[in-house]
Amino acid sequence: MSTQLQSVIAVVPAAGVGSRMKADRPKQYLKINGKTILEHTIEKLLSHPQVSQIVVAISDDDPYYPELALNQNPKVVRVSGGSERADSVLSALNCIAEQQLSDWVMVHDAARPCVQLSDIDKLISGAMSHDVGAILAAPVRDTMKRGAQGQIEHTVERADLWHALTPQMFRAKPLWNALSEALQQGVSITDEASAFEWKGLSPALVAGRSDNFKITQPEDLALAEFYLSQNKE
């Protein structure tokens, strides 16, 4: 498969509420160093030379996004977000198809502002050279336990376990098909790769940095602030 790519569209599903943060607003609108997490994330994606545009999925009743400068950025297109991640991604893919923006898309979590450009480079290379596409992932280093009712059942072999990260990059049309078919069948889709897995396809794993973590808990904010202060790409 060709490894030449002129540009890619980044999709950012940002319609979630982030209830585990126990904050007064969705976590993507919490601020780190004067900017919202969503602004950090989108600015990092747009700083990559091959990311030409962002399609961000936002809830229709979101009162915070219109106040951001992003709302006036011509490279950032807003679409209506859905109740689930897959619905938001499909909404973005519909926009991309209607405007014929790109054959390739990379989907990135709104709450992963610490992704490095070098990892995006590796992801693009990995996706372009694979029949299905690719995701960033990090090998599991900790001992893993399967539990039930607050007790350990057994230790899980970690040799072949990976933490799925984002971005995840695929051709737009096959991703739309995979997500649509999975949702029609009532399949639980937690990331884009899982839709392809359900169809019996195996996206490539591209080893990424472990500091590309998802902000989920209140204590994650300080860690993200540290990584962002160190990341001068």
Swiss-Prot record:
E.C. designation(s): 2.7.7.60
Enzymatic reactions: 2-C-methyl-D-erythritol 4-phosphate + CTP + H(+) = 4-CDP-2-C-methyl-D-erythritol + diphosphate
Record carries keyword Transferase: yes
Molecular functions per Gene Ontology: 2-C-methyl-D-erythritol 4-phosphate cytidylyltransferase activity
Primary role: Catalyzes the formation of 4-diphosphocytidyl-2-C-methyl-D-erythritol from CTP and 2-C-methyl-D-erythritol 4-phosphate (MEP).
Family annotation (HAMAP family): IspD
Record's protein name: 2-C-methyl-D-erythritol 4-phosphate cytidylyltransferase
